[in-house]
From Swiss-Prot:
GO molecular function: proton-transporting ATP synthase activity, rotational mechanism
Protein's name according to its UniProt entry: ATP synthase subunit a, chloroplastic
The UniProt record lists the keyword Transmembrane helix: yes
Pfam families: ATP-synt_A
Domain of life, source organism: Eukaryota
Gene: atpI
Taxonomic classification: Eukaryota, Cryptophyceae, Pyrenomonadales, Geminigeraceae, Guillardia
Amino acid sequence: MTYNLNCDISNSFYRLAEVEVGKHLYWEIAGFKLHGQVFIVSWLVMLALIIFALNGTRKLNQIPSGIQNFMEYVYEFLQDIAKNQIGEEDYRPWVPYISTVFLFIFGANWAGALIPWKLIQLPEGELAAPTNDINVTVALALLTSISYFYAGISKKGISYFSRYVQPTPILLPINILEDFTKPLSLSFRLFGNVLADELVVSVFALLVPILIPLPVMTLGLFASSVQALIFSTLSAAYIGEALEDHGH
């Protein structure tokens, strides 16, 4: 009896520590193969954020307390990111986008770090943070690219593209290349950090007792939060750059 119990605990522990890279649960929809585990965890993260937002705004009081107070603090924090990077005049329309990006990445990273997804068996692949899939981080980076192009064109019209030849036409290739490197740096930075953190924790859990990786997991939670902050801050900075008046 004791032996069987120890075996069960040991098997659960090794499932937590197991490292799988490149395996996915594929859903085929209209001829396209989608990474099913990414959608599952993403939906759960979005559901948790929606429930949290509804609870925080259900009964608003003039003097905030409890979860409403926390929600207002988070909103002011995210509003400050947009204001500082985009500017007092133009930041308000972009607060929802910057907030959504930050909260999704933050929730996805923490879900991957805190929840023992590996104990849930799938036919193929495993549940994990959506942000450890390069497709997700590239999609988020492309959304930011579309956003700052939209911001610049909506404010300046076709004259927005004059920025590519400023301060001199010689810089045209470099300025064009810069717009390609922005989404690349955003996506690979987030993907690399999240994937590396999960691999490090898994390897430590495999090599040493379960309590030893806890400091590494704590560091991973901190790093995950920082990555959400970096991504949202850079997104706001790129949008602010697109809205900036280069003629002054």
